[in-house]
Amino acid sequence: MKKATFITCLLAVLLVSNPIVVNAEVAGLIPCKDSAAFNKRMVNSVKKLQARLAKYDANTPPALALNKQIEKTKTRFATYGRAGLLCGTDGLPHLISDGRWSRAGDFVFPGLLFLYITGWIGWVGRGYLLSVAKTSKPTEKEIILDVPLAVKFMSSGFAWPLAAWQEFSSGQLIAPNDDITVSPR
């Protein structure tokens, strides 16, 4: 019985985790370097900056800043073209999340960074509220922040995954059922 359950679970995992390959042509996307709309966007962006540049004398601070911005714009579009991003008919890059590992870097790193930052904010806020709850006027300190105390929690929040795991494994993270109020229905 255990063997049959194991094989069934294994087959289910293999069927669910099998990525479906998406053709870019089917979705109407083409590589940005080959997209006429993408190249037109680059030309238009550079033309707008050059039109602004014409209003200033050469070697003035605004002219130098605009020249630098023109170079950055050209570099940005060239980087998008080399990165293998796919563009739609609007000329804008689109992210493909179809299960291919070659595209994972486009959204996995930003996603993990988002989760880390939101976890940091939540962990720091939780620590601040737990600390303030022990003071004589907790409601006042929730409305008017105690900045030195908040900064103390913010500076120690970078290690929140380790602190959360430590509190979870010691049983401090989860409140006992007696401490959780139930509202009347």
Swiss-Prot record:
Pfam family, one: PSI_PsaF
Organism domain of life: Eukaryota
Chain segments annotated as transmembrane: 104-124, 143-163
Assigned GO CC terms: chloroplast thylakoid membrane; photosystem I reaction center
Signal peptide (UniProt feature, chain positions): 1-24
InterPro entries named among the record's database cross-references: PSI_PsaF (IPR003666), PSI_PsaF_sf (IPR036577)
A biological process term (GO) from this entry: photosynthesis
Keywords from the UniProt entry: Chloroplast, Membrane, Photosynthesis, Photosystem I, Plastid, Signal, Thylakoid, Transmembrane, Transmembrane helix
Coiled coil: none
Subcellular location: Plastid, Chloroplast thylakoid membrane
UniProt membrane topology term: Multi-pass membrane protein
Gene3D superfamilies according to UniProt: Photosystem I PsaF, reaction centre subunit III
Record family assignment: Belongs to the PsaF family.
Biological role stated in the UniProt entry: Probably participates in efficiency of electron transfer from plastocyanin to P700 (or cytochrome c553 in algae and cyanobacteria). This plastocyanin-docking protein contributes to the specific association of plastocyanin to PSI.
Name of the protein described by the UniProt record: Photosystem I reaction center subunit III
Source organism of the structure: Porphyra purpurea
The encoding gene: psaF
